[in-house]
Amino acid sequence: MAKPRGRKGGRKPSLTPPKNKRAAQLRASQNAFRKRKLERLEELEKKEAQLTVTNDQIHILKKENELLHFMLRSLLTERNMPSDERNISKACCEEKPPTCNTLDGSVVLSSTYNSLEIQQCYVFFKQLLSVCVGKNCTVPSPLNSFDRSFYPIGCTNLSNDIPGYSFLNDAMSEIHTFGDFNGELDSTFLEFSGTEIKEPNNFITENTNAIETAAASMVIRQGFHPRQYYTVDAFGGDVLLSAMDIWSFMKVHPKVNTFDLEILGTELKKSATCSNFDILISLKHFIKVFSSKL
């Protein structure tokens, strides 16, 4: 029994001349049908390849968007804190900083803050500080406003890193990026109780809708202001994030102890800029570098 006709296998077209006019017409019709079938198949394969590429690009954009929203919500939560409750320090670049220990290549760390997290933070930020050429990136101690001792940016978090209430009580609580990138972060955040937080030391003072409303007003064009913690590069169409916020994001990652923070900081320095307030890093470059280390 002959095999069915198809792209692979089956009978090959006959090379013998047709015996009559009817046979010639039938053979021409079969050849035309076979040609149209192959052309249609090639067209569908090209469309499938294009759809695959498009889906991959959409998947990458979704990951970038999830990471951006995660950082943005964390950033806005901190912005809503009263100034006397901010235990996460912010950096400022000063042309002539006061006489003190500075982060200009050699940092004097107080033994009070000598912990594994601080050492990791120092290793990471030591590579980034060179972008502020001719300036010293300094951070005053939050313990005492008159204490002018300095330590790496955001290395000391007196509130045990994360408050006991979640500001990710929506779809963002199931972020899965870079191969279950944040899968274990869900256990870090407790479910939001839905009741008003009355404790004076709690960070979260507004609900998710208020945070989203504030987010719309925070995007600015090229430039930076001390009250705004990230900016948009008007030329490259990229988002620039504070190095402090990137560190706050990385230090709670379950694999933080497996990262080579010195190499990570060195690679991120390639896209870092100094805004006279903080060190800013390209979001796209951070995603590319960070995902390659997982």
UniProtKB/Swiss-Prot annotation:
Residues 44-72 are annotated as: Leucine-zipper. Changing S141A: Impairs largely arsenic-induced phosphorylation, shows strong sensitivity to arsenic treatment and a strong, although not complete, reduction in arsenite-induced expression of ARR2 and ARR3. One of its GO terms (cellular component) is nucleus. Transcriptional activity is controlled by regulated degradation by the ubiquitin-proteasome pathway in absence of arsenic. Arsenic-exposure results in stabilization and increased transcriptional activity. Disruption phenotype: Leads to hypersensitivity to arsenic. Impairs the arsenic-dependent induction of arsenate reductase ARR2, arsenite transporter ARR3 and vacuolar transporter YCF1. Belongs to the bZIP family. YAP subfamily. This is Arsenical-resistance protein ARR1. Changing C274A: Impairs nuclear relocalization in response to arsenic and transcriptional activity, and leads to arsenic hypersensitivity. InterPro entries: AP-1-like (IPR050936), bZIP_sf (IPR046347), Yap1_redox_dom_sf (IPR023167). It comes from Saccharomyces cerevisiae (strain ATCC 204508 / S288c). Residues 22-72 form the bZIP domain. Changing C132A: Impairs nuclear relocalization in response to arsenic and transcriptional activity, and leads to arsenic hypersensitivity. One of its GO terms (molecular function) is DNA binding. Residues 1-11 have a biased composition (Basic residues).
